Design a protein with these regions (language model features):
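Short, flexible, mixed-charge acidic loops at enzyme active sites
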Residues: 1-7, 88-91, 246
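Rossmann-like dinucleotide/flavin-binding elements
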Residues: 100-145, 191-195, 213-214, 234-283
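Short glycine-rich, acidic/polar surface loops and turns
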Residues: 227-235
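Glycine-rich active-site loop/strand segments that organize a redox cofactor
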Residues: 1-27, 164
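Flavin (primarily FAD) binding-site architecture
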Residues: 76-92, 208-220
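A Rossmann-like FAD-binding core segment of flavoenzymes
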Residues: 26, 34-71, 130-226, 282-285
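Redox-cofactor binding/interface segments in oxidoreductases and associated redox assembly factors
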Residues: 76-77, 114, 204-205, 245
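Glycine-rich His-Gly loop
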Residues: 40, 79-80, 248-249
């Protein structure tokens, strides 16, 4: 809801209970403007180096220039969408296959197959259906995930029930071609059946994971079981003093645990700790 997305005491006013992506982006841009925050867009951080005091962050601009910034603290909040979970099957690198969904309009009256059944896959399926695409979903499980957003799950299930969106449960994708997706479906008696789904475009929305490259580069301890960072969840500081990780960036493959709402709580705790140190005052009870 709007209230859960608000930051810095700035109200997010929308016409409906849940703001659209555009409304949220407009809101955050206005917060940056009103607070006069020093935001450097089109700067990709390539390295973070620990110094005797503080850190040195190196970034590459869209013009190919290298920029170096020094700071006493660093808070990493890069999310996890840079790293798709690849299927490792033939045809995954074809031009009609994508691990990211942007918009539905180009696929009007096209056959679209979505691999996956998480929130990203569910959102894409509904958007594509509304835009007039012929949508088929493929999921290895026997039902939609319980973790689906509560306002999306009933809508998706109703579209499947009425036949507007087709779904193959208990199915594993074996291969993607230029005009089809080949799956192996487990029938009720346990026997496998090969099914060929005519497809113009495939969206493999099977999840993402947070990169550990920058974390490991600065010396943050990474847990081997899920690639999450060692964090103090009272402050979201890592084992490296002065280095904080906010949101899903520190949770490796545990991305379903983190949302915008609780990521904002991480930020509040981290900023409170940074302010405390800058002011050199004890944390109030």
């Amino acid at each position: 809801t709007s209230e859960r997305l608000e930051i810095g005491g700035h109200p997010l006013v929308t016409g409906v209970d849940k703001p659209t992506r555009k409304e949220a982006l407009d809101y955050y841009r206005k917060v940056v403007h009103n607070e006069k925050l020093n935001v450097k867009t089109f700067h990709e951080v390539t390295n973070i180096k620990r110094l005797a005091v503080g850190f040195e962050t190196t970034a590459q601009t869209d013009k190919g220039q290298s920029v170096t910034l020094k700071s006493r603290f660093v808070a990493l909040a890069t999310g996890y969408f840079d790293n798709p979970k690849y299927l490792g099957i033939p045809g995954e690198d074809l031009p009609n296959v994508s691990h990211y969904f942007t918009e539905a309009h180009p696929y009007y009256e096209r056959n679209v197959t979505i691999i996956g059944a998480g929130s990203s896959a569910a959102d894409a399926a509904l958007d594509l259906f509304k835009a007039g695409a012929n949508v088929t979903m493929v999921h290895r499980g026997d039902s939609f995930r319980f973790s689906l957003k509560y306002w999306i799950k009933p809508n998706l299930e109703n579209r499947v029930k009425e036949g507007s969106i087709k779904v193959h449960f208990n199915s594993v994708t074996k291969e993607i071609t230029s005009d089809a997706v080949i799956i192996e479906k487990r029938l009720e008696d346990g026997t496998p059946e090969t099914i060929i789904i005519p497809t113009d475009q495939t969206f493999a929305l099977t999840g993402y994971y947070a990169s550990t490259k920058l974390l490991e580069g600065v010396g943050v301890v990474i847990k081997s079981e899920d690639f999450s960072a060692q964090l103090n969840e009272d402050t979201f500081e890592t084992n490296v003093g002065g280095f904080f990780v906010i949101g899903s960036a520190g949770y490796g493959t545990r991305t379903s645990d983190i949302f915008i709402e609780n990521g904002l709580i991480h930020a509040e705790k981290a900023v409170k700790e940074v302010v405390r140190r800058l002011e050199n005052t004890p944390v109030s009870a």
